C-alpha cells in the first residue's frame, strides 16, 4: 500500500550555511522519499512564508526548529494513513491544515518538504523514477530543458558592484542536453581565463558564477561574449544570453537606482535601457526587468520587446496562480519563473506550469540561491511543459547536482531523449 506510515523532518544546512528543512516520508509498503527545501536571497514580498525561529542565540535567528516540529507533530499526525499517490489530495490537506493564505502558520518550508518527499515516496512505491512518475501524472512527453547558466553573479547574490543579479548563457544550438552542458561548461572555464587575463577576481557567488567588480553592468556582457568566442562558440547562434535584473532590489522611491552606472532612471527610461541592450546583444530572456509592483512598467516593457525577448516574471508572479492570472489577463510578461518554495506545495507548482502552457507563456523551473543537493526540480523540468531550467553556474555541488540528474535522465530516455534547444522559447512570436 502507498499510504503514509510515518513522516519525519530534521534541520540541515543549505549551500549558504543556513539551516533548512529536510523531510522524509515512509509508506506502509516500505517505500521511502526524502526532500530538502531551498531558500532565496532576493525574495518577492508575496512569496509563501518560510518559517524561521527568530532566536538570535541560535544560527543568528535563522533556525527552522519550529517548522521541523510542525512536521513531526501536526503534519505527521494529520497525514498518517493518507494515500501518497494522491498528490493533489495530500497537498490540499496540507494547505487546509495550515489555514492561512501565505502558509505562515506551519511554514511553507514545512509544507513543501513533506509535499515533495511524499512524491518521491509514491514514485518509489510505483517503481518509477520521479520524472517518470510525474510525467504519468501530467501526461507530458518528457523532454530535456535548456539550461540558463548563471556565470556572472551580481546584486544580492554577490559582494560586488554589479547591479544586475545574474548574467546567463543559454546553449540553444545543440541537439542534446549533454552537448549543451558541455558548451556551457567550456564557456565557464573560458570566462575564468578571460577574467584572469583582465586582472579581475575569479571568486564565485552564491550560485557558482564569478563575481568580479566591473566598471559597468554592460562590461559583464562584453566579457561573456569574449569568453564565448574564446571557447570556440558563436554568440547568437550556438549560445544566447540571459539576464536576471532583479530590479525590485534597486527600485527606490519610484526610480531604478543603478549604482554601477551612476544613474537613477524612471520606468520609461529603464525600459529604454533594457530595450537598447536587447537590440545590441543576443539577449533572449530577461527576468524581473521591472520591479514587482511596477506593473505599468512591466506592461511597457512587454509591449516594447515582448515579441522578441522572453520576459520572465519571478518576483512579479512568485509562482502564485492568482497573481499569475492577473498577468495573463493584462498581457504582462510572457513567461513565469517556477520556484517550488514560492508557493509551497508540489501540486500548486505543477498547476502554475500548466497555467503557463494554457496561456502560451513559457515556464522556467528554478532553483534558489540557498540550495541543497536535492534534485527534485530537475525531474520537474523534464516531466512538465516547462522548457527551461535555471539552476546556477557550472561549479558548486548544489548547482551541478541538478545538471548531473538531467544527464542521468537523458541517458535513461535513450533514443527518445529530446532537447528543447531553440524551441524552448514558446512565448515568442518570431
UniProtKB/Swiss-Prot annotation:
Enzyme active site: 207 (proton donor), 339 (proton acceptor)
Pathway: Carbohydrate degradation; glycolysis; pyruvate from D-glyceraldehyde 3-phosphate: step 4/5
InterPro entries documented for this protein: Enolase (IPR000941), Enolase-like_C_sf (IPR036849), Enolase-like_N (IPR029017), Enolase_C (IPR020810), Enolase_CS (IPR020809), Enolase_N (IPR020811)
Localization annotation: Cytoplasm; Secreted; Cell surface
GO CC terms, sorted: cell surface; extracellular region; phosphopyruvate hydratase complex
Taxonomy, superkingdom: Bacteria
Regions crossing the membrane: none
Cofactor note: Binds a second Mg(2+) ion via substrate during catalysis.
Co-factor requirement: Mg(2+)
EC numbers, comma separated: 4.2.1.11
Catalyzed reactions per annotation: (2R)-2-phosphoglycerate = phosphoenolpyruvate + H2O
Any one GO MF annotation of this record: phosphopyruvate hydratase activity
Residues that hold Mg(2+) according to the record: 244, 287, 314
UniProt keyword list: Cytoplasm, Glycolysis, Lyase, Magnesium, Metal-binding, Secreted
Binding site for (2R)-2-phosphoglycerate: 165, 339, 368-369, 390
GO biological process: glycolytic process
Main location: cytoplasm
PANTHER family: ENOLASE
Assembly notes: Component of the RNA degradosome, a multiprotein complex involved in RNA processing and mRNA degradation.
Known function: Catalyzes the reversible conversion of 2-phosphoglycerate (2-PG) into phosphoenolpyruvate (PEP). It is essential for the degradation of carbohydrates via glycolysis.
NCBIfam families to which the protein is assigned, alphabetical: eno (TIGR01060)
Stated family: Belongs to the enolase family.
UniProt-recorded name of the protein: Enolase
Native source organism of the sequence: Stenotrophomonas maltophilia (strain R551-3)
Primary gene name: eno
Amino acid at each position: 500500500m502507498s499510504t503514509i506510515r510515518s513522516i519525519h523532518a530534521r534541520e540541515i544546512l543549505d549551500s549558504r550555511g543556513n539551516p533548512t528543512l529536510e523531510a522524509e516520508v515512509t509508506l506502509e509498503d516500505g517505500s521511502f522519499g526524502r526532500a530538502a527545501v531551498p531558500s532565496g536571497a532576493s525574495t518577492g514580498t508575496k512569496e509563501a512564508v518560510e518559517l524561521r525561529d527568530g532566536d538570535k542565540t541560535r544560527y543568528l535567528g535563522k533556525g527552522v526548529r519550529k517548522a521541523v516540529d510542525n512536521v513531526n507533530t501536526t503534519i505527521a499526525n494529520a497525514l498518517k494513513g493518507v494515500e501518497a499517490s494522491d498528490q493533489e489530495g495530500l497537498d490540499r490537506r496540507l494547505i487546509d491544515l495550515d489555514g492561512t493564505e501565505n502558509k505562515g502558520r506551519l511554514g511553507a518550508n514545512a509544507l513543501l518538504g513533506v509535499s515533495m518527499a511524499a512524491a518521491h515516496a509514491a514514485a518509489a512505491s510505483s517503481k518509477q523514477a520521479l520524472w517518470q512518475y510525474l510525467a504519468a501524472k501530467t501526461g507530458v512527453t518528457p523532454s530535456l530543458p535548456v539550461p540558463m547558466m548563471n556565470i556572472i553573479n551580481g546584486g544580492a547574490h554577490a559582494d560586488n558592484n554589479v547591479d544586475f543579479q545574474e548574467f546567463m548563457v543559454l546553449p540553444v544550438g545543440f541537439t542534446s542536453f549533454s552537448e549543451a552542458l558541455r558548451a556551457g561548461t567550456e564557456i565557464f572555464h573560458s570566462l575564468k581565463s578571460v577574467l584572469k587575463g583582465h586582472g579581475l577576481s575569479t571568486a564565485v557567488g552564491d550560485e557558482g558564477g564569478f563575481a568580479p567588480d566591473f566598471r559597468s553592468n554592460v562590461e559583464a556582457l562584453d566579457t561573456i561574449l569574449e569568453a564565448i568566442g574564446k571557447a570556440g562558440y558563436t554568440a547568437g547562434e550556438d549560445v544566447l544570453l540571459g539576464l536576471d535584473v532583479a530590479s525590485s532590489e534597486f527600485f527606490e522611491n519610484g526610480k531604478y537606482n543603478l549604482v554601477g552606472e551612476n544613474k537613477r532612471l524612471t520606468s520609461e527610461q529603464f525600459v529604454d535601457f533594457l530595450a537598447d541592450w536587447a537590440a545590441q546583444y543576443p539577449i533572449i530572456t530577461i527576468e524581473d526587468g521591472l520591479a514587482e509592483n511596477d506593473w505599468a512598467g512591466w506592461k511597457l516593457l512587454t509591449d516594447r520587446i515582448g515579441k522578441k525577448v522572453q520576459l520572465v516574471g519571478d518576483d512579479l508572479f512568485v509562482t502564485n496562480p492568482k497573481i499569475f492570472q492577473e498577468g495573463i489577463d493584462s498581457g504582462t510578461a510572457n513567461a513565469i519563473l517556477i520556484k517550488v518554495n514560492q508557493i509551497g506545495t508540489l501540486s500548486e507548482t505543477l498547476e502554475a506550469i500548466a497555467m503557463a502552457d494554457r496561456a502560451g507563456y513559457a515556464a522556467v523551473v528554478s532553483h534558489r540561491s540557498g540550495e541543497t543537493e536535492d534534485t527534485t526540480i530537475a525531474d520537474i523540468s523534464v516531466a512538465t511543459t516547462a522548457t527551461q531550467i535555471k539552476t546556477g553556474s557550472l561549479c558548486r555541488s548544489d548547482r551541478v547536482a541538478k545538471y548531473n540528474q538531467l544527464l542521468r535522465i537523458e541517458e535513461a530516455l535513450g533514443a527518445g531523449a529530446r532537447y528543447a534547444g531553440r524551441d524552448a522559447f514558446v512565448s515568442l512570436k518570431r
